[in-house]
Design a protein with these regions (language model features):
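Small-residue-biased structural context
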Residues: 1-143
């Protein structure tokens, strides 16, 4: 069973918005500093890696382990939507590996910024699609 905050569109949307805001703030630090400011950029990227891992991927893991399982059982016909949302999670996981590898090897901050912007765009599209799904099936989920 997934927690009640995941099943309710409004509370779930607030979870997504909060983490998107944290990521945008850390990205502003990375994008705003001179590319030669190694120590500040390094801290910003490490913060972003931790946010992506500890908040976004952990949240995705919980959705897949509980919410998506419950939706699949309670709301027939959602398989294609759930597959697309899970694919978004997979893309974020793969990009996080790329970001972490870039951080630990080359430290090309322009590349890391691009990866973060790509991840954020995927996350925003994912959030919108997930909220649409919850609008369609929220009343069928246990509270």
């Amino acid at each position: 069973m997934s927690g009640p905050a995941l099943k309710k569109k409004r509370s779930h949307m607030m979870i997504h918005r909060a983490v998107e805001g944290e990521i945008e703030e850390a990205m502003a630090v990375l994008d705003g500093y001179n590319r030669n400011a190694e120590s500040i950029n390094g801290i910003a990227v490490k913060t972003l890696i931790d946010l992506w891992h500890d908040k976004v991927i952990a949240h995705a893991d919980e959705e897949e382990a509980s919410l998506y399982v419950e939706i699949k059982t309670a709301v027939p016909g959602m398989d294609a939507t759930l597959l697309k949302l899970s694919r978004d999670h997979d893309l974020l996981r793969k990009l996080l590996v790329n970001l972490s590898t870039e951080y630990s090897t080359h430290r090309d901050y322009a590349e890391m910024s691009m990866i973060n912007h790509t991840m954020l765009n995927i996350l925003k599209i994912h959030s919108s699609d997930e909220m649409a799904m919850l609008s369609d099936c929220e009343e069928n989920l246990s509270t």
